[in-house]
Amino acid sequence: MKAIFITLEGPDGSGKTTVGTLLNQKMEEAGIDFIKTREPGGSPISEKVRNIVLGIGNEEMDPKTEVLLIAGARRQHVVETIRPALAAGKTVLCDRFMDSSLAYQGAGRDMDMEQVLQVNLYAIEDTIPDRTYYLDVPAEVGLARIAANKGREVNRLDKEDISYHEKVQAGYEKIIKMFPDRFMRVDATMQPEEITEVILADILQQLS
């Protein structure tokens, strides 16, 4: 069985974390040799950067600083975690990657998405996902889910208003048009178990 690089993307409240946990279990049951990781983070240095980028109290962070910090964390994640796993024949399942920067920092912060893309391509070089699952949910539904989930860790981006999250969603639509071959859109208004089964079926097909 070949190894591939898989990413989960979607706006806040799309259920990525829940689906990622279920998918982790289902992939183990299917006998897939893989690692599960996340961004920002995924390596010791990158996790430290995550705390800075998402930390409450850092609301004054300049948008370009945000882009560069996340790209730096991504570089370390690629070098320390993702590439070694792929080289060892392990599939990589990652909660967010480059596309999140294009959507959240590029579109969400009204920055030039092409510039954000080039910064990230410099960081990751040829380590580009083979398959990206976009969990599609309306911005207002996602924010309502966040508000209802009292146990969820609140980060700096959660405090943005709905207009920011709508721009993020519009950004994702542009990204899907930029990279149509690797994206699969999944209706995230379905139950997490249903979403997981849809994604797992496609993963098994990609690995065959």
Curated annotation (Swiss-Prot):
Superkingdom per UniProt: Bacteria
The keyword Cytoplasm appears for this protein: no
Gene3D superfamilies: P-loop containing nucleotide triphosphate hydrolases (3.40.50.300)
Pfam family, one: Thymidylate_kin
Catalytic activity: dTMP + ATP = dTDP + ADP
Record's keyword annotation contains Flavoprotein: no
One GO term describing the cellular component: cytosol
List of residues binding ATP: G10, P11, D12, G13, S14, G15, K16, T17
Enzyme Commission identifier(s): 2.7.4.9
GO biological process, one term: dTDP biosynthetic process
Molecular function as annotated in GO: ATP binding; dTMP kinase activity
The entry's keywords: ATP-binding, Kinase, Nucleotide biosynthesis, Nucleotide-binding, Transferase
PROSITE patterns xref list: THYMIDYLATE_KINASE
NCBIfam families named in the record: DTMP_kinase (TIGR00041)
Function comment: Phosphorylation of dTMP to form dTDP in both de novo and salvage pathways of dTTP synthesis.
Family per record: Belongs to the thymidylate kinase family.
Protein name as catalogued: Thymidylate kinase
Organism (species): Listeria welshimeri serovar 6b (strain ATCC 35897 / DSM 20650 / CCUG 15529 / CIP 8149 / NCTC 11857 / SLCC 5334 / V8)
Lineage: Bacteria, Bacillati, Bacillota, Bacilli, Bacillales
Name of the gene encoding the protein in the UniProt record: tmk
